[in-house]
């Protein structure tokens, strides 16, 4: 089975491929149902093409799954030359009006039916096959038994199913709640996820609500009660659990699924990498290239990624899918940063030379001072050592890497290095140093706006993630702010 991962921008595309995806799906400009994802713009086609060369054999799918109005068709036609610059292998569409345009201008790209089309039966699949589609992304509402029936009826049609991620309480994209409450339509890519918002009542009704006596009752159905106040004082109206099928991949394979899809173009780099890695290992175990015991810790690491309560959705029956949850997804870790390719010898020497020059310049400045001024400067340095940082010093067997800080991290904080094939490696304080690569100064902390390098005794592949434990995390307690 193919592993298909989300890529909301170029960086996420790189991590999807590096951490094990056979294919990734992206959105281009305003024609994707994840408009709030970064999507792809400007000259990023050059970076995408470079990634395809770096990871030969990996596929690129492009979501053009909005409901096209005339203005959208005109806008797309006006940008055809731009779209042709991308090495797209397949388009994911729901609107049939765009199909003849794609077939004319992208004759070598495959057509995939989007889950937004809500395909749930074999006759619909036959129809799409006759129109030139090679794959259908089945609606999440289809059971595994129905998947098997569809595959048997149309064996030459590839079947793609979501295996992991958020689920909509409605048929995909057909919910009107966001449009009604906020004016932001799910069919145009602007879903505000109002179903997952947490609602309470105003002060006058709060005591009644807290008692549990305040409920909504439908006029003709007196036994159908909906509590207005629940959980930690708030009600999530229609918040579905997250889909998780990693423990049931063999069932999906036997049902005839050709491609496993991970939801989440708006999720973080950390989410994309960790979830892709877990499913890659699970699929490798299923194929027999690694053992189940080797895959197990990677599968367990899914709990270290932001998630809600999980479910198997509709695959084994509707009862499981109808269960809702409350609260935001959460994670015990904070993504601290990413590691680039190791500096070469000349680059490394330049950093050390910059550090030596920084110290020499400081000493020259002190030597030129009046004795009293020099003494005052030395006292100030003793009281505030951060004003005069030490220079990075060479250590045998250590390596220097570019480091992109994504959250403030104090030097000495325990770091966990995440790579595609190593579950995690812990770097304690004595095993690494943060430094400024421009002046060679040792840093006491790093921020996203800092120039930074990581100096360590560990060999780290480019693209490794660095995480730290979240001090505010409590197991079993879901924070309403999310992470």
Residue ranges and their predicted role:
Residues 1-19, 23-33, 59-64, 71-77, ...:
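Surface-exposed amphipathic alpha-helical tracts and adjacent flexible/coil segments at the periphery
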Residues 9-12, 30-105, 109-122:
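Active-site beta->alpha loop and helix N-cap motifs at the rims of alpha/beta catalytic domains
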Residues 91-94, 116-120, 134, 138-142, ...:
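Short, well-structured alpha-helical patches and their helix-loop capping segments
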């Amino acid at each position: 089975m193919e592993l298909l991962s989300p890529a909301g921008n170029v960086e996420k595309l790189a991590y999807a491929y590096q951490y094990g995806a056979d294919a990734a799906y992206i959105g281009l400009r305003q024609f994707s149902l994840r408009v709030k994802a970064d999507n792809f713009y400007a000259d990023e086609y050059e970076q995408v093409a470079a990634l395809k060369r770096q990871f030969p054999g990996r596929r690129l799918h492009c979501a053009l799954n909005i409901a096209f109005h005339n203005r959208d068709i005109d806008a797309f036609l006006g940008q055809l030359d731009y779209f042709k610059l991308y090495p797209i292998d397949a388009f994911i569409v729901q609107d049939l009006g765009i199909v003849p345009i794609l077939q004319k201008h992208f004759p070598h790209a495959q057509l995939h039916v989007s889950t937004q089309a809500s395909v749930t039966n074999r006759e619909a699949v036959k129809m799409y096959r006759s129109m030139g589609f090679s794959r259908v992304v089945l609606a999440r509402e289809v059971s595994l038994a129905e998947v098997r029936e569809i595959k048997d009826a149309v064996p030459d049609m590839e079947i793609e199913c979501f295996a992991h991620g958020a689920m909509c309480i409605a048929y995909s994209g057909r919910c009107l709640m966001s449009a009604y409450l906020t004016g932001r339509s799910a069919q145009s890519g602007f879903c505000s996820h109002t179903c997952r918002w947490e609602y309470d009542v105003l002060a006058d009704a709060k005591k009644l609500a807290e008692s549990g006596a305040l409920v909504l009752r439908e006029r003709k159905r007196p036994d159908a009660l909906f509590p207005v106040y629940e959980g930690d004082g708030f009600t999530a109206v229609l918040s579905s659990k997250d889909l998780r099928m990693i423990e049931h991949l063999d069932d999906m394979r036997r049902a005839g699924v050709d491609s496993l899809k991970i939801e989440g173009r708006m999720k973080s780099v950390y989410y994309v990498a960790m979830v892709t890695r877990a499913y890659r290992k699970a699929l490798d175990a299923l194929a027999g290239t690694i053992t189940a015991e080797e895959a197990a810790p990677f599968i367990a690491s899914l709990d270290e990624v932001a998630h809600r309560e999980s479910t198997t959705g509709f695959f084994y029956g509707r009862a499981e899918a109808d269960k809702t949850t409350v609260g935001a997804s959460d994670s015990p870790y904070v993504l601290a940063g990413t590691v680039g390719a190791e500096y070469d010898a000349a680059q490394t020497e330049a950093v050390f030379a910059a550090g030596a020059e920084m110290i020499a310049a400081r000493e020259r400045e002190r030597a030129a001072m009046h004795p009293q001024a020099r003494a005052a400067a030395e006292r100030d340095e003793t009281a505030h050592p951060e004003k005069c940082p030490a220079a990075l010093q060479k250590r045998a067997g250590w390596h220097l890497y570019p480091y992109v800080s994504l959250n403030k991290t104090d030097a000495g904080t325990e770091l966990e290095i995440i790579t595609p094939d190593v579950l995690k490696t812990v770097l304690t304080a004595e095993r690494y140093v943060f430094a400024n690569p421009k002046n060679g100064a040792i840093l006491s902390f790093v921020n996203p706006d800092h120039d930074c390098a990581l100096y360590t005794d560990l060999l780290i592949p480019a693209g490794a993630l660095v995480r730290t434990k979240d001090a505010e995390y409590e197991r079993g307690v879901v924070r309403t702010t999310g992470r």
